[in-house]
Amino acid sequence: MNPLIDVRVQRLPHSDGLPLPRYETSGAAGMDLIAALPEGEPMVLAPGERAMVPTGLAIALPQGFEAQVRPRSGLAAKNGVTVLNSPGTVDCDYRGEVKVILINHGADAFTIERGTRIAQMVVSPVTQARFEEVETLDETARGAGGFGSTGTKGR
């Protein structure tokens, strides 16, 4: 098992009574994020509609880490609902509320209620890059072949 890191969480008033993110199984990579909507005021996503859903949480990640907000596979497979900017990135220096941009690609309206598990959050180490401008790049077998240049058939 990998070592745990400490992430400080600030619960905002509209998330009172909701559970904090947690791993559902011992092998889980992501923790579920929960909709912190007002009780009795569901959000309905019509087909093709998108909305920013509050989680009621702000986090302080350690330096050198990020959190990625990713879709829940069950929501995508069963309802066509996914995270629009997947993965959404929460930087270690961001201190605002974590919100999830959901979009409904399904054929039917999708209702989000208080406590609905809407996305998953994966905390990962970050590697920063330093770009070095050069005149030419090393040659490779692929070269400048772009989208679809390697075909679709298995080898």
From Swiss-Prot:
Query: What InterPro entries does the database record attribute to this sequence?
Result: dUTPase, dUTPase-like, dUTPase-like_sf, dUTPase_trimeric
Binding positions for substrate per the UniProt entry? R72, S73, G74, N85, T89, V90, D91, K99
Which class of enzymes does this protein belong to? hydrolase
Pathway, per UniProt? Answer: Pyrimidine metabolism; dUMP biosynthesis; dUMP from dCTP (dUTP route): step 2/2
Which molecular function terms from Gene Ontology are attached? dUTP diphosphatase activity; magnesium ion binding
Give the EC number.
3.6.1.23
Q: Does the keyword Hydrolase apply?
A: yes
Q: Which CDD domains match?
A: trimeric_dUTPase (cd07557)
One Pfam match: dUTPase
> What Gene3D superfamilies does the database record attribute to this sequence?
2.70.40.10
Query: What cofactors does the UniProt entry give for this protein?
Result: Mg(2+)
**What is this enzyme's catalytic activity, as reactions?**
dUTP + H2O = dUMP + diphosphate + H(+)
Q: Which SUPFAM superfamilies match?
A: dUTPase-like
Family to which the UniProt record says this protein belongs: Belongs to the dUTPase family.
Q: What does this protein do?
A: This enzyme is involved in nucleotide metabolism: it produces dUMP, the immediate precursor of thymidine nucleotides and it decreases the intracellular concentration of dUTP so that uracil cannot be incorporated into DNA.
Q: What is this protein called?
A: Deoxyuridine 5'-triphosphate nucleotidohydrolase
Q: Give the organism the record lists.
A: Parvibaculum lavamentivorans (strain DS-1 / DSM 13023 / NCIMB 13966)
Q: What is the lineage of its organism?
A: Bacteria, Pseudomonadati, Pseudomonadota, Alphaproteobacteria, Hyphomicrobiales
